[in-house]
Amino acid sequence: MDNLCKLGWLANEFLLKDSFDAEKYKPEDIGIVLSNANASLDNDIKYLETTKEIASPALFVYTLPNIVIGEISIRHTFKGENAFFIFEKFDAGFIEQYVSNLMDNDILQCCICGWVELLKDEYKAALFLIEKDKSTDSVNFTKENLTKIYQLQNG
């Protein structure tokens, strides 16, 4: 597993720990929407170095950023809609609009979404668990709240 996948996988484990009941949903009702600024560039650089000798298939597998979604999905048996977007910076408005559309059109009942960025020794992760049926202690799913939480986690 490359470092981007490790970061996303670990952030997801913290997100779901003690706060998520997957049994409430069918696997196809749980999706993942992630984004970052550098795609899989950290691993792409490592892969490029291996091509000077013999290209490493083990590294090539991780030259797509959406592999992190696959690793999370396999771990938790999530089978719903998923997408990975590349933006210059965290775009809470896009995340809110995209995930809301998936929920409003009954494509998903639950979505893990957010930002998973890693390049060399710098990394940022902010994941959000969005459920169509809100609990009493839920925070409203708005771009303002996403931005506020992202900034608290990442400065």
Describe every region a protein language model picked out.
Residues 79-80:
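Conserved thiamine diphosphate
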Residues 1-3, 7-14, 53, 57, ...:
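Conserved beta-strand-centric core segments of catalytic alpha/beta enzyme folds
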Residues 1-71, 75:
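Conserved beta-ketoacyl condensing-enzyme motif
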